[in-house]
Design a protein with these regions (language model features):
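Conserved catalytic cores and adjacent C-terminal regulatory segments
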Residues: 3-146, 152-158, 162-181, 186-192, ...
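Short, compositionally biased segments
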Residues: 202-215, 220-258, 355-363
């Protein structure tokens, strides 16, 4: 039998406590450290280290003047090395806390736990980590942390400051406390290159918003937000709608378009409203940011959305007399007749300002058609209607504008108005989009968003972006015959022979057989839609050939005559007496005439004549291309004469707008394209009577 006296039992209990949790903070009587067997080894301010020889333990106490009989014991360890190490840490890190406010055992425990887990952290780091942010506002705390190791801007083992830590935790109150009460630096990056704003973005939007508004990293806020949005979209993927509102309000101009585009590409709602009922488009309009507004509009922003005062973005633009924004909004079909809560329409506001906005409003002129509709309708019942779309690269936007206007006047989708649709190059792509039921306004947005990708770099452009776009729109396995009505004709050129031969991609059986000795062509049932569109738009020097096919614009940039001949052969082969009653041919805009001053080539080494020869060669090359791709001159005259001979209604000239400047097929400048669409929109309004007559005929027949 082993007997323990009371002293031995007490020592055993102490050793058991030490072995279980030697760092647990608990209140102990000061009397336990009086008398023999206790040696005060070290004392720094109010932190004292004792050695208990009886139990071979080292005890660290925090002396509290307010409680003279009891005191918190910070640790009780059996290793002298541990005791000396943690005593120094505790003495340094606890002083700012106990100098500021009285501490109890339960509030000390998280502090000392943090000190042991992160010995290189400053007391400001610890205050943020433990949620004791109330200490940050006291002058005594700030004065104590002014030393190098405890500085408010000191960095931990990974380079993070206390502000980094607060932002990373999403602790809005601590962030505000540090920014308002302490001299924190906002431009310090950690060892991974992240600023406090990076950390804020990764965890909570509200913290990031506060940091931005209070000036964190304001000098590079545009770059920072862009980086944060990339992380937020790919990692967090939440609150994107709130981000779009926020970016519209605080982002500086340089990267605003990229920020908006990044959010919208990750399914952010473009028409989200803030507390005052304003959409991002309203906010950007008020700030006069036309380029960013264009980004929103090309991603589906509703130009006619009203705020709480009933104002659309066009109301705001008119009040500001901002010409660029007015053009952008009207081009994207903002209604000039929508009243706000005061009964004011954008047109009325323009008239009241009298500063120039009024002249920008499209005004309908009372023109009359060049033919008598009542007489025509009587004889054209039960006849087919043909839509022809010219080629023109990015100028397909002009076609889309005219088709949208026609669709609005008719009140029906374009595909329901025509029996036949023919197109070349960009017109061929649109023809296929029409028969497959694509929304025209979506196509307008798509053209704007895809142009930089399709026309990236130098000519000839890589085919991958264009083919990716076509596969996405039509599907990789969709066949031409999957949609049978309306019948479609897409022109291309067979360039595996001389002379070249026009080829038509169809969604019906060809009206004639061929005895071609060359490699046989794919039948419509096996022809992929995206490949037909790609073949029709394989413009030489712009894109590589599509196998043996080149752009149809080389032989039929205006496909009207070829389409009419095809329909005639089709009806003849089927012994069908159904005639072609109407042909509507839409152009991509007429370029202005320019004077040519030099055409003669010289056989001379004289520098002057050599320069003239180079200029003449350039002019001749342009003339040759104009002749090959002409769609408005002789082609229109021939088509009109053909229609007159066959008693077919032909409406062309009023639906190919005159452009003030030449627009290249690969133009990507938004300003040039918007001006082109503005001229198209204005032209359509001038020809409103003709457009209404055409729409009435198409709707009624």
């Amino acid at each position: 039998t082993v007997f323990f006296n009371r002293g031995h039992l007490k020592c055993f209990n102490l050793l058991d406590t030490v072995s279980n949790n030697p760092y647990r903070v608990r209140d102990v009587p000061l009397s336990d450290y009086a008398g023999g067997g206790k040696v005060k080894l070290r004392e720094e301010n109010r932190v004292v280290l004792y050695k208990k020889s009886q139990c071979q333990s080292w005890d660290c106490l925090l002396m509290c003047p307010n409680t003279p009989t009891m005191t918190p014991r910070l640790f009780q360890v059996v290793s002298e090395d541990d005791a000396m190490n943690w005593f120094s840490q505790y003495a340094l890190k606890l002083q700012p806390f106990y100098d500021t406010l009285p501490l109890k055992a339960e509030s000390i425990q998280p502090i000392v736990n943090c000190i042991r887990s992160h010995p290189d952290w400053s007391c400001a780091h610890i205050a943020v980590k433990t949620g004791l942010r109330k200490f940050l506002k006291y002058t005594s705390f700030q004065r104590t942390v002014s030393c190098a190791s405890n500085h408010i801007n000191s960095q931990n083992e990974v380079g993070q400051t206390p502000l980094h830590l607060a932002c990373e935790r999403g602790d809005l109150a601590s962030v505000k406390q540090l920014l308002d009460e302490s001299q924190v630096r906002t431009d310090i990056s950690d060892f991974y290159g992240d600023t406090p704003m990076h950390c804020a973005c990764k965890h909570r939007f509200s913290v990031f918003a506060l940091c931005s508004q209070l000036g964190i990293g304001v000098n590079d806020l545009n770059i920072v937000i862009l980086l944060f949005l990339e992380y937020f979209c790919f990692e967090a993927h939440k609150q994107l709608d709130m981000w779009l509102i926020f970016v519209s309000q605080v982002a500086v101009l340089r990267f605003l378009c990229q920020m908006c585009r990044l959010l919208l590409e990750h399914d952010c709602s473009v028409n989200v409203l803030n507390k005052t009922g304003q959409s991002p488009l309203h906010i950007l309009t008020k700030q006069g940011r036309s380029k960013a507004a264009l980004v929103l509009l090309t991603h589906g922003a509703d130009a006619n959305l009203k705020d709480q005062d009933g104002n659309t973005a066009l109301h705001l633009a008119m009040k500001m007399n901002h010409m660029d924004l007015i053009k952008v909004l009207i081009v994207f079909w903002a209604d000039v007749e929508i009243p706000n809560n005061l009964g004011e329409t954008p047109g009325l506001i323009a008239a009241q300002t009298s500063k120039g906005a009024r002249r920008l409003l499209p005004v309908s002129r009372p023109l009359v058609p060049s033919w008598d509709l009542a007489v025509v309708l009587e004889g054209l019942k039960q006849m087919d209607k043909l839509l022809c779309l010219d080629g023109g690269g990015i100028k397909g936007l002009v076609l889309i504008q005219m088709l949208i206007a026609l669709e609005q006047e008719a009140g029906q989708p374009i595909r329901e108005l025509f029996d036949w649709v023919a197109g070349t190059s960009t017109g061929g792509i649109l023809a296929l989009c029409i028969i497959h039921g694509k929304r025209l306004k979506d196509l307008q947005n798509l053209y704007f968003n895809m142009k930089e990708q399709v026309f990236e770099g130098w000519r000839p452009y890589t085919k991958k972006p264009l083919e990716k776009f076509l596969k996405k729109e039509f599907g990789e396995d969709t066949k031409m015959t999957d949609v049978s009505h309306p019948r479609v004709m897409v022109t291309s050129v067979l360039a595996d022979r001389r002379p070249c031969k026009l080829h038509i991609f169809r969604n019906y059986e060809p009206p004639y057989s061929t005895s071609d000795t060359f490699r046989p062509l794919t039948i419509p049932q096996d022809q992929l839609v995206w490949k037909a569109a790609r073949a029709s738009s394989a413009a030489p020097t712009y894109f590589p050939p599509m196998g043996r096919f080149l752009d149809g614009g080389l032989l039929a940039n205006n496909p009207t005559l070829d389409a009419m001949a095809e329909i005639h052969q089709y009806n003849k082969a089927l012994n069908d007496t159904k005639k072609l009653g109407m042909v509507l041919s839409l152009g991509t805009g007429k370029s202005p005439e320019v004077e040519v001053t030099s055409l003669e080539l010289f056989k001379s080494c004289n520098p002057v004549k050599l320069a003239k020869s180079l200029k003449a060669a350039n002019n001749l090359l342009k003339i040759l291309m104009d002749c090959c791709t002409d769609s408005d001159g002789c082609a229109v005259d021939r088509a009109r004469a053909f229609c007159e001979m066959t008693d077919t209604l032909y409406q062309r000239c009023v639906l190919s707008p005159q452009l003030s400047v030449e627009v290249m097929l690969n133009e990507v400048d938004d300003g040039v394209l918007l001006n082109m669409l503005w001229e198209t929109r204005t032209y359509l309004n001038e020809q409103r009577a003709v457009l209404q007559s055409v729409a009435q005929f198409l709707r009624d027949h």
